[in-house]
């Protein structure tokens, strides 16, 4: 069946035809039948260079040999035990070894589950209610954080979701990213702050980087006020450095969440933090968290192989991706400048995004002012030329270890044509 026929069929049994909002784009999304390395193939047999990469999960590329071998071996032993396994402890030790801020780890399944638990831990630890989040930061689709969120929520213009409880969201205070004064004023006005949660690099409102001293000032202020600081490293964990953004910036949070690149494409997440906080989790403590699939041996085997591969490659991996990103982003900037197209390019590590605006993009408000229609034109032209990026300016373009210089050159040629379509 073709993409169009499959989508018509899907809409009959799946709301809007997709299982996550940002996967939809007009007139219909393509349906993937297989993937390998840096490429995916749709049901119409088009080969696409993949820069969506599972929205950042596939740091090592599709079907990475080390991970496939590890998972295949585990499949012969079973898929779900619902008992402790040796692999869970091995994985926890690997995570702790890469993240010095973490004393103990609890495994889960999704990024949203991890942030939900992190917030519950902060409330249990402080015995307070209110959480501070930043505009445009996306921490999953649960009520506590689905307020002025990024990702698909921003793309679809949903500031607060229908069905969410005001009684829950009223305990979420929203401040502007990269604005320390706004944070200080909010803390001064509210004495019931249980925690502050932040994406250290904002990767769900396009790509927005923390300004100089923002994260260090954030850490200082939360310490001075005895407020737990939660780093949501669901995207940045392992992607920007083996120890995530906290290694990259030299900041130690109290609680960390991670997922995505943790397992390179398998459903697993983790919450880690200081011993005195983590020991509050049940059954030893009174902060409840549970899941049938938490620590399942398939995902654990993938995560162990992923971290071991990352640790083995380390400088070689990250220096390659940073070099590719610098070359690509610089060339893209030159192209758009030569064409006279107002734009901003934000990039770091293995992530970048172009915004069609003449003003720096440093927060939620400036991101929303970028020309979304021009971005959609860019996206469609790239797709026609065999390049797949996320279909929203509020997402990020992700490089993987599977990408080659030839892939980048082909992609730059496609971006050149796409920018021409934007200009016209």
UniProtKB/Swiss-Prot annotation:
Main localization of the protein described in the UniProt heading: cytoplasm
Catalytic reaction(s) noted: (S)-4-amino-5-oxopentanoate = 5-aminolevulinate
Listed Gene3D superfamilies: Aspartate Aminotransferase, domain 1, Type I PLP-dependent aspartate aminotransferase-like (Major domain)
Record's subcellular location: Cytoplasm
Protein EC: 5.4.3.8
Cofactor: pyridoxal 5'-phosphate
Designated name of the protein: Glutamate-1-semialdehyde 2,1-aminomutase
Organism: Nitrosopumilus maritimus (strain SCM1)
